[in-house]
Amino acid sequence: TYIFWELVGVSSFLLIGFYYSKPSAVAASKKAFIVTRFADLGFLIGLLLLSYYAKGLDFAHINSQETIEQLNGIKVPFIGMSLLPLAAILIFMGAAGKSAMFPLHIWLPDAMEGPTPVSALIHAATMVVAGVYLVARLFPVFAVAKDAVAVVLTVGTFTALFAAIIAITQFDIKRVLAYSTLSQLGYMMLALGVASWEHPLGYTASMFHLTTHACFKALLFLGAGSVIHAVHTNDMREMGGLHSRLPITHITFLIACLAIAGVPPFAGFFSKDEILAAAYYSGHHLPFAVALLVAGLTAFYMFRLYFMTFWNEPKDLKKHEHAHESPFSMVFALVVLAIPSILAGFIPFGHYVYKGELEHHGINWLIASSSIFVGLCGICLAYLMYFRPNDLPSRFAYAFGFFYNIVYHKFYIDEIYLFITHNIIFKYISAPFNWFDRHCVDGFMDLTAQATLQAGRWLRSTVTGHLQTYFVWVIAGMILLCLIIWRLNEVIIWGLAIIGLSGILAAYIYQFVCALLKKTEPLKRIDRD
């Protein structure tokens, strides 16, 4: 799992940096790679802990009751919790990086630098949902590890609300969808956070929403790509009035917006309703309220995007006049994805999870009506503000000027990370380590090299080519060896010494005799210079 987990990260790095000639694309790919690698460090440590104490990494083995009880019984004294929640939190760290949970979300909006089909691939069905799927695969572990599931619930709830608020103020069509993805991933994590053995509906709801979200989010990204192909800009402030120019894109995009807004009978209604029901029935009333609020915000910012793009008045007449529907190869994919965006909610998803034991036999109309009501409120508010030209958006921005500016700049999270990196990590951590590396580590290595070089030069000076000198060195070596033998007094060393000395003496006697008989030339001084 870990190997292919890392290969997913490498693939996203290559896809995001597809336009390698663009500095922004290169920076975005490196940012995604570094952030996810940092998160994967926790994942790796968690895997090592499980491998050492559980004696295996097979999902069936780790999720078994015997293994869970064994890990839960091992205490970690310096942390104050058992090994099971510690390993689960570390694994969730990797999942949070891959699924862009706060505060490791900063790479995902910049991933928009890749081609739009790549964005659809990454944001809809592959990379970003891998973290959610990993937590779901380890549901038995998290269900027992209460500290870990509390972390999952807190992070998921905050991310869902945090990203939805930011999406309200963005004008780049792909960035709105990126923050929408963040919010929906938080929704899925929230569902897993409220799940337990007593109330397992959240587990099913999370996987159900993961499936439906893959359909309508891929449709949204490909629809955005069709719009960008027509008007050659990502800025929604330069769009408007495209419903007549892009009829197929318009209809399919509207279907996707209705699905993600949770309007019945589209797919998103059923999966969102399941998440709300899971939070409500499990007794997590604050996450339920936040999820309900996020449902309204989602409907608002998605129809804000829809009305600014396809209705209102054209902002750039030249671009509007030249806009045309995308070719068949592009709109065909939109039509295909529109079908599951409508019908995927009717799939009896419980049959694929626990053989029907998690099914419910009816709809809680209080929860369903609440979800529909907040969704319609969001749509109506977006209609009033963006369907026709008016000054409501500017008045809203002026009324909430300070807060609006903070939200528009994404709460300055990137700037905070940049400040921490440059002014704290580089200055107070990297600089001292750099000095230690250059002056201590490199200094020790340079000193060793110089000492070795000087020793070599000294030994080279002893090679004179005169047999008398060699004979003196042999005698000195014999005396030194005898002293060592005298101190150690070992039979084996005596034997080795006698054999070695005999060989040395035989060699020098042979060389001496050869020199006397002039059968060989005297040894010449070796000049290695």
Where does each model-flagged region fall?
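Hydrophobic membrane-spanning alpha-helices of multi-pass integral membrane proteins
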Residues: 128, 156, 256-257, 329-346, ...
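Short phosphate-coordinating micro-motif centered on Lys-Gly-acidic
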Residues: 6
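Hydrophobic H-region at the start of alpha-helical membrane spans
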Residues: 38-40, 154, 335, 368-376, ...
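Aromatic-capped, Gly/Pro-kinked transmembrane alpha-helices
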Residues: 350-366, 384-529
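Generic recognition of cysteine residues
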Residues: 215, 257, 377-380, 440, ...
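Hydrophobic transmembrane alpha-helices and their helix-loop junctions in integral membrane proteins
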Residues: 1, 10-325, 340, 346
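Hard-cation-handling environments
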Residues: 323-381
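Hydrophobic alpha-helical membrane-embedded segments
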Residues: 217-219, 296-305, 374-395, 505-511
